[in-house]
């Protein structure tokens, strides 16, 4: 498997669970826990420089320049063991069924040759593997079977903020 970002790691995990012997090849070094910006006093500066999502700004040893000047999409890339999951924010959205039919619904680009429902079982499998949490039946999300875990609690800080928002009514 070339690359141990989200896709490569999931594929390697699935293959190894089925008994396959798997080798992963990565472009970059291991990042040690104490190297992450959260352990630095200058976290804000670090996040804008050596931890920037853009390799053109970051310029780490294993980065290579990208040209996204003609694209509205700016990829989040990181060359290391774990790939772009080093920037992972635990947000795992699914495409909506309508995202697969942009030509039909919005007359732009092309429709996908598959539908959301063709991928749903793979989304479910990934959610189970990643132990995704959330609210079942949330209308802001596309249809899905039951989530593997209940929503994460707000915690003390979240409860204070929620209480303050409630007082604004």
Residue ranges and their predicted role:
Residues 1-104, 108, 113-117, 121:
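N-terminal glycine-rich phosphate/pyrophosphate-binding loop and immediately adjacent elements
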Residues 64, 91, 103-169:
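Conserved redox-cofactor binding core of oxidoreductases
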């Amino acid at each position: 498997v070339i690359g141990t970002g989200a896709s490569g790691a999931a594929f390697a995990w699935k293959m190894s669970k089925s008994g396959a012997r798997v080798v992963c090849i990565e472009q970059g070094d291991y990042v040690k826990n104490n190297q992450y910006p959260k352990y630095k006093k200058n976290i804000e500066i670090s996040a804008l420089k050596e931890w920037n999502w853009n390799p053109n700004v970051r310029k780490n040893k294993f980065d290579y320049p990208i040209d996204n000047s003609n694209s509205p999409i700016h990829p989040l890339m990181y060359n290391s063991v774990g790939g772009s999951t080093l920037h992972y924010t635990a947000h795992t959205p699914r495409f909506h069924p309508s995202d697969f039919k942009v030509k039909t619904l919005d007359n732009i680009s092309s429709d996908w040759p598959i539908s959301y429902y063709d991928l749903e079982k793979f989304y479910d499998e990934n959610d189970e593997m990643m132990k995704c949490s959330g609210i079942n039946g949330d209308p802001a999300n596309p249809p899905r079977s039951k989530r593997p875990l209940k929503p994460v609690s707000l915690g003390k800080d979240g409860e204070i903020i929620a209480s303050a928002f409630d007082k604004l009514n």
